[in-house]
């Protein structure tokens, strides 16, 4: 408990010593600066001419060749699979 009171006392005394020094520097008048001998020369802002940029073009894309739609062909007749021919067409009787 004694160390706690001692630390508070040291803190309070250091605050009393340091704070007025900070206030003293705060309320001082600003340092005197003599005026410049010549007024600054007004120069118009430097403008560079615009740079010509070509219009933006997309890079070429390799597209596959366009195939023409196939010509309509009649459907191929395939022989029936897994089915016996009708008996009328059977010549082996």
From Swiss-Prot:
Residues 34-83 are annotated as: 10 X 5 AA tandem repeats of P-P-[HQVRT]-[HKNT]-[DEKR]. GO terms for cellular component: extracellular region. Residues 46-93 have a biased composition (Basic and acidic residues). Residues 1-24 form the signal peptide. Residues 30-93 are annotated as: Disordered. It comes from the Eukaryota. PANTHER family: PROLINE-RICH EXTENSIN-LIKE PROTEIN EPR1 (PTHR34629), REPETITIVE PROLINE-RICH CELL WALL PROTEIN 3 (PTHR34629:SF4). Belongs to the plant proline-rich protein superfamily. ENOD12 family. This is Early nodulin-12A. It comes from Medicago sativa.
């Amino acid at each position: 408990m004694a160390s706690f009171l001692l630390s508070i006392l040291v803190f309070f005394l250091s605050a009393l010593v340091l704070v007025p020094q900070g206030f003293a520097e705060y309320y001082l008048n600003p340092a005197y600066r003599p005026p410049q001998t010549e007024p600054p020369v007004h120069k118009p802002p430097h403008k560079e001419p615009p740079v010509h940029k070509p219009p933006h073009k997309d890079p070429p894309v390799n597209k596959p060749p366009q195939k023409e739609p196939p010509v309509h062909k009649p459907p191929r007749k395939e022989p029936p699979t897994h089915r016996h021919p009708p008996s009328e067409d059977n010549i082996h009787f």
